[in-house]
Design a protein with these regions (language model features):
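N-terminal amphipathic, basic-rich helices that act as targeting or association modules
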Residues: 140-169, 191-195, 204, 223, ...
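Asp/Glu-centered strand-loop micro-motifs enriched in Gly/Pro and often flanked by an aromatic residue
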Residues: 185-195, 200-228, 252-253, 281, ...
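Repeat-blade elements of multi-bladed beta-propeller folds
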Residues: 172-176, 213-233, 260-312, 348-374, ...
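Topology signature of small-to-medium multi-pass alpha-helical membrane proteins
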Residues: 2-155
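Long, low-complexity segments enriched in small/aliphatic residues
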Residues: 425, 548, 552-632, 640-641, ...
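N-terminal pre-domain segments of enzymes
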Residues: 140-186, 545-571, 651-655
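Extracytoplasmic/lumenal domain signature
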Residues: 194-207, 236-260, 268-280, 313-347, ...
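Short, solvent-exposed loop/turn elements at domain surfaces
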Residues: 179-186, 208-213, 237, 443-444, ...
Length: 699
């Protein structure tokens, strides 16, 4: 009897310990939520976590003591959580995940353990409940891999014809396929009926290794049967489009300075196919000494144009991969001429990462400058060169507009002016090139900026192609101290005017998620723009504009202000941590000025819309775009509080910029949870279509 009784007690304890363990875990979860909830409520946040945490703490204790009341209390808390979650975020799938998924998992485990509670005589009901909850978990797991929040088109668009890029042909000779930057391939061999059957045709490996400094961001060119690619270190490779076999490789021998190695695109120039070349006095001597080869079949009859990360402009024979030595000095133009100081301790603060713009027999280039270094950085000057000789044709220096070519001997182009690091578009008929400008260095501070250059910051600027003189400017951010510079290439499109004609339009995407629709003849908005008041709090020594432009006549993507309810996590805990972090931040919307208190930027300096730009199906009048929804946190720190010798000399998130010549350095990082996941709820980007004729979001 004694042995049997002991065995029975041992068996009972073995059956009880899983419930006791579950109760203890539930109590710990409740304690953490309650403590975090107290902190959140003290910051003005939701009281839910205090109440739910306390309830789970008590329920866990009761379950550990084998009290049925613990199960009932847990169930009531779960039901209350469902009501709270639906009230806070509705039926938004991704927002419901961290609110309900943990309860679903806990409820499933509890259902399996219910038979261990006194008074629960049947296993059938608990196991049936566990089965239902288990199916819910499986369904939720499947739903994670399904699209959510999809907006579908009501009907197929009416096909129309558009002449903005007529006669471009089947090649991809420009970074955005066309001079208008439409980057849409109107081909039909790949279509919705067979896209799922595509297989890899060939693979080519460049031999370069991606590291912290290098990223492969190239959009290849395709001319006839050849694909032209450039690598982060500016190697140019010609490949057979059919089989991927290398035809030639050109290495310009740039130094890997481990900073910001990119080559986003190339230019293509074929002199014999330029029907109406521009006539420049600078080229007369060159043309007399370089008679055209019959039929354009001589050396360098077709040329690849490249800018490099050591600030050179090169031309390469598209057939052989050899330098075109009659261009510039032995095939190269030194782009540092007239720029003043550009080399700082073997780190270049000026070079080029985007594709050069080839307009007939001209090459137009801007330049990349190192973000956040100083108030004294290289110029954002725009220059045009002869595509034949490499001679400088004109320069546009917004700080010294009287300089139309090289600056006076001993001088330089205006320092730290807004640059054009992205890609322009151009309209040959109107004779205009459209520049997407950056904001003036050092990005997050503007107390020193002169009025002469302020108006060109974060703007679309139209220049006369022949002279480089400004024709019009439209600014998308006033006094930009958020790094909301224009990264996307302008896209040109002719909008039907309803009277049988068209209006030449320019579509400009911005990092703010705003889409501006402008008349490309004069910069006048074609879709309504409102100037809205914005927060006026700013660090001492700087200022903010009273209003900012909002393109209310076009859809905006990802531009809604964040709230505490938008905070996300994979679990209870990281969502709560993000809610607490959000409440601690300085945030009054997208134009909250950087301050000495950590400040939330959203949409951040990644966008909205970045340099990937948009595509336009001109026959249907559809604008295709994808946005980024990743917030950042920035903090101004007085120089006196920083050991500047230990600053992280980076270019992206997670680094500190010295901003020499200002009162502060700027620290910036991603707004992530403790698990390294963005604190805002998915989606972290969408792909969408906008009807440019109705100006409505289609899908």
């Amino acid at each position: 009897m004694t042995t049997a009784k002991a065995d029975s007690e041992t068996s009972t304890k073995q059956r009880r310990w899983p419930l006791a363990l579950f109760g203890a875990i539930l109590a710990v979860i409740g304690l953490v939520l309650a403590v975090g909830g107290i902190q959140l409520a003290a910051l003005g946040g939701s009281w839910y976590y205090i109440l739910a945490g306390a309830a789970l703490l008590v329920a866990g204790g009761l379950l550990a003591a084998r009290r049925v009341a613990g199960a009932w209390l847990f169930g009531l808390t779960a039901v209350a959580t469902v009501v709270w979650a639906l009230a806070e975020v509705g039926l938004n799938f991704w927002m419901l995940v961290p609110r309900l998924a943990p309860f679903l998992v806990l409820a499933f485990v509890l259902a399996l353990l219910l038979p261990q509670l006194p008074g629960v005589r049947s296993r059938r009901v608990p196991h049936l409940l566990a089965g239902v909850l288990g199916l819910g978990l499986v369904a939720g797991g499947v739903a994670v891999f399904q699209p959510h929040g999809v907006i579908q088109a009501a009907a197929a668009p009416k096909v129309q014809r558009n002449s903005a890029t007529a006669g471009v042909g089947g090649d991809w000779q420009h970074y955005g396929r066309t001079p208008a930057g439409t980057r849409f391939a109107p081909f039909d061999q790949i279509n919705p009926g067979n896209v799922d059957q595509l297989e890899v045709a060939w693979t080519y490996r460049t031999g370069e290794i991606a590291d912290g400094a290098s990223e492969f961001q190239n959009t290849p060119l395709q001319v006839d049967d050849t694909v032209f690619v450039c690598t982060p270190l500016n190697k140019v490779i010609a490949l057979d489009a059919e089989n991927g076999q290398e035809r030639w490789k050109f290495d310009p021998k740039v130094e890997d300075r481990k900073t910001w190695n990119r080559c986003r695109g190339l230019g293509y120039y074929e002199p014999a196919k330029v029907e109406q070349p521009y006539a420049f006095a600078e080229d007369l001597d060159w043309q007399q000494s370089h008679p055209a080869a019959p039929g354009g079949n001589g050396t360098c009859a077709s040329r690849i144009v490249m800018t490099t990360i050591d600030a050179r402009l090169l031309q390469i024979d598209a057939k052989t991969g050899e330098l075109c030595e009659d261009f510039g000095q032995n095939g190269a133009v030194d782009l540092t001429v007239g720029m003043g100081k550009v080399d700082y301790d073997n780190v270049l603060w000026y070079y080029l990462t985007s594709a050069p713009t080839v307009v007939r027999n001209m090459i137009i280039i801007g330049g990349w400058t190192f973000d956040g270094r100083s108030v004294d950085e290289p110029s954002g000057v725009i220059r045009a060169f002869s595509a034949d000789s490499g001679e400088l044709l004109w320069a546009w220096d917004m700080g010294q507009p009287e300089i139309t070519k090289l600056p006076p001997e001993g001088g330089s182009y205006s320092r730290s002016t807004p640059n054009v690091w992205s890609t322009p578009a151009f309209d040959e008929e109107l004779g205009l090139v459209y520049l997407p400008t950056g904001n003036q260095q050092p990005d997050f501070w503007g107390g020193h900026r002169p009025e002469t250059t302020e108006k060109h910051s974060s703007a679309v600027v139209a220049l006369d192609i022949l002279t480089g003189r400004e024709r019009w400017t439209y600014q998308t951010v006033h006094h930009d101290i958020w790094d909301y510079d224009i990264a996307a290439q302008p896209a040109l499109y002719d909008i039907p005017d309803g009277k049988g004609g068209v209006t030449p339009a320019l579509v400009q995407l911005t990092k703010r998620g705003q889409i501006f629709l402008l008349d490309r003849r004069d910069g006048r908005p074609l879709a309504e723009v409102e100037e809205r008041p914005v927060p006026q709090t700013v660090a001492a020594g700087d200022w903010v504009a009273k209003t900012q432009p909002y393109s209310v006549g076009m859809p905006a993507l990802g531009a809604e202000p964040l709230t505490e309810a938008d905070m996300w996590g994979a679990t209870f805990f990281d969502q709560l941590a993000c809610r607490i972090a959000f409440r601690k931040l300085n945030y009054e919307g997208e134009f909250t000025a950087p301050s000495t208190k950590p400040t939330l930027l959203y949409p951040g300096y990644y966008g909205g819309f970045n340099w990937g730009s948009a595509a336009i199906d001109e026959d249907r009048g559809y604008l295709f775009l994808n946005d980024i929804r990743i917030p950042q946190v920035v903090t101004l720190i007085p120089h006196s509080e920083v050991d500047e010798s230990k600053l992280v000399a980076g270019h992206g998130v997670g680094s500190t910029y010295p901003m020499q010549g200002t009162p502060f350095v700027i620290d910036h990082e991603a707004f992530n949870s403790p698990l390294g996941i963005p604190c805002n709820a998915p989606p972290w980007g969408v792909f969408a279509a906008v009807d440019l004729n109705t100006r409505q979001l289609v899908w």
